[in-house]
Each structure stands twice: as C-alpha cells, then as structure tokens.
C-alpha cells in the first residue's frame, strides 16, 4: 500500500517593511523640501523661518509614514492639518495666498515691464505665515502620496509645475530643483515595493552630486 505524501507548506518569509517606508519617507521629504524652497523664493519678504516650514512638512510626512507602518495610526495624517487650522484659524490663508500670487505678479511686471492686474488684498505678515504653514502641510501630504505610490508622472508634473512657476515668477532657485529631481530619480530607481538596492542608492547619490555641480 502506497503511503500518501505529506506536503508541508512553509509560510512565506516576511519582509521587513521599515527600510522601504524609510526610503519612501526620504523621497517625500526631498520632494516637499524642494517645493517649499521654490515657494520660499517666490515671496517678496520672508514670512516664516525656513526651518519652521521644513519642520511642518517633515512632521506631516512622518505622520503619513507612521500610518503606513501601523494601520491603527492611519489617522495621523490629519493631525498637522488640524494643528494649522487651530493655530491660524484659517482666516488668513486666503489673503496670504493672494499676497503670494501678488508677489509673483509684481516681480513679473518689474522684470518684463508688464501691467498684470494684482489682487485687491491687504494681507498681514500673520496671513502670509498662515498660508505658508498650510502649504507646508499640503505639500507634505502630496509629496507622500507621490512617493508612496511611485507616481513618476505625477512627480514629474509636480517638478514641472514648480519650475514653470519659478521661471514666470522670477524666483528660480537651483537647489530647490536639485531636491525635486533627486526625489524623482530616486522613485525611478526604486522597485515596486518601494525598496532600493545599495547600487540604486549609489546611483541616486551620484545623480544628486551631478545636479549640484551643474
């Protein structure tokens, strides 16, 4: 009598998700940092310390990463948004946004001797700071979605948007686009699980160095 074979199934080896999440977090920080650098150079005056704007965006990205690692913390992405709404009241954000657009239009008019109409607004420094804080949170959220989903077309369009805006507004700042392009190249070198090999990291670092030297 033949003995039936006993098939033993071994569970699939679990992979550590944290390196992939850390890499995604880095890409999102680079992407949001480049966008915020570009935005900061389009203001006529400094409205918030740059490190504070970066800190808001980084905290936002970290909250998104925490939600990715633990589903119970998936609500954390809304915490920075609520914090900005509570501290600013949201009342100054529209005026601050119009003031930011006015700064770009004024620079365009002075560079090209044009007469583009400006928005009628009387924004205070607090209104501008409120808008900058809101933009830091929204930029962090968008950068995380682009990096986590490996959305290369969206990332490229994101970079192109800030490039066109900077050129039209007369506030082109090369380091901002080094960060933006490094993030996009990092997404290109990542696999579908958002991980990256040691060779890919070397390539990404080399590309960043070349962009810095250009």
Describe these PLM feature segments.
Residues 1-214:
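Helix-boundary/low-complexity linker signature
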């Amino acid at each position: 009598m033949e003995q039936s074979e006993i098939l033993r199934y071994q569970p699939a080896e679990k992979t550590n998700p944290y390196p992939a999440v850390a890499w995604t977090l880095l890409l999102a920080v680079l992407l949001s940092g480049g966008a915020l650098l570009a935005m900061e150079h389009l203001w006529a005056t400094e409205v918030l310390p740059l490190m504070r704007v970066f800190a808001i965006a980084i905290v936002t990205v970290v909250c998104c990463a925490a939600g990715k690692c633990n589903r119970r913390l998936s609500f954390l992405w809304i915490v920075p948004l609520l914090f900005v709404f509570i501290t600013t009241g949201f009342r100054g954000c529209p005026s601050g946004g119009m003031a930011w657009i006015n700064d770009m239009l004024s620079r365009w008019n002075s560079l090209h001797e044009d007469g583009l109409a400006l928005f009628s607004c009387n924004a205070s420094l607090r209104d501008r700071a409120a808008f900058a804080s809101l933009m830091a949170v929204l930029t962090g959220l968008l950068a995380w979605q682009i990096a986590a989903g490996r959305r290369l077309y969206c990332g490229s369009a994101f970079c192109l948007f800030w490039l066109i805006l900077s050129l039209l507004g007369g506030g082109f700042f090369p380091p901002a686009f080094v960060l933006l392009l490094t993030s996009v190249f990092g997404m290109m070198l990542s696999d579908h699980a958002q991980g990256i090999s040691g060779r890919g990291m070397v390539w990404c670092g080399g590309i960043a160095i070349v962009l810095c030297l250009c």
